[in-house]
Amino acid sequence: STIRDLDRQITTLFNRLPCKPLGFPVGRAPSLATIISEIGDIQRYPTLKKFLSHLGWCPQSFQTGNYRLEHPKMSHAGNKYVRRLIWMLSIFAVQRIPRYREYFQRRVSEGKAKMHILVAVGRKLLSALYAILKKGIPYDPNWEENSRLALARR
């Protein structure tokens, strides 16, 4: 069918990319190609914060005078289809990847809202993707633990 043909073409083009997220835990070539097409050149984002802001995956602060919004809402910046895709990848990660499932269950037991936890999982996935694309290295499943150890040694 036409959708399968398009998926094959996207996968073919995705495989030609010089720097692709090898071994990324969630998403196949079409979904990762969608995110990468929205990102463009990763060098445009000097920091993770700017990267997340471009994708609309950050809280939006609202303040006027002495009033400050108690619970900030998600920013609606960026492409809504990409945000929705990141949301779906977060749900998939919680359902299928033990490390993210454990994180989700631990945060639920601490009393956090499930939606907030999914946003945090999405941020973890996007920060891993940012590091992969920025440094040009394959995905390391233990990157969080390794970075904690590296920071502890300083």
Descriptions of predicted regions:
Residues S1-R154:
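A detector of single, family-specific signature residues
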